[in-house]
């Protein structure tokens, strides 16, 4: 019984692989260019202190943190 289920599963996966499923169009992985534009680097963060090379204040989106 188990070998029949295994054979059926193998045949189904060969005929319809999981990679054939369409991905959702609004996933960030589908649009790496937009994801890169939305990403703000630490040097461009408004709390980044260029002299000390760290972030002052809140360290939620900025790294390294001055502490």
From Swiss-Prot:
A Pfam family annotated for this UniProt entry: Conotoxin
Tissue: Expressed by the venom duct.
Main location: secreted
MF term (GO), any: toxin activity
Bridged cysteine pairs (disulfide): 54-66, 55-62, 59-65
Domain of life according to the entry: Eukaryota
Signal peptide positions on this chain: 1-20
Compartments where located: Secreted
Residue numbers carrying Pyrrolidone carboxylic acid: 53
Key words of the record: Amidation, Disulfide bond, Hydroxylation, Neurotoxin, Pyrrolidone carboxylic acid, Secreted, Signal, Toxin
Keyword Protease: no
Propeptide: 21-52
Chain positions with 4-hydroxyproline modification: 64
InterPro entries membership: Conotoxin
Modified residues (Cysteine amide): 66
GO cellular component, one term: extracellular region
Record bears the keyword Signal: yes
Domain comment (free text): The cysteine framework is III (CC-C-C-CC). Classified in the M-2 branch, since 2 residues stand between the fourth and the fifth cysteine residues.
Record family assignment: Belongs to the conotoxin M superfamily.
Protein name: Conotoxin VnMMSK-02
Record organism: Conus ventricosus (Mediterranean cone)
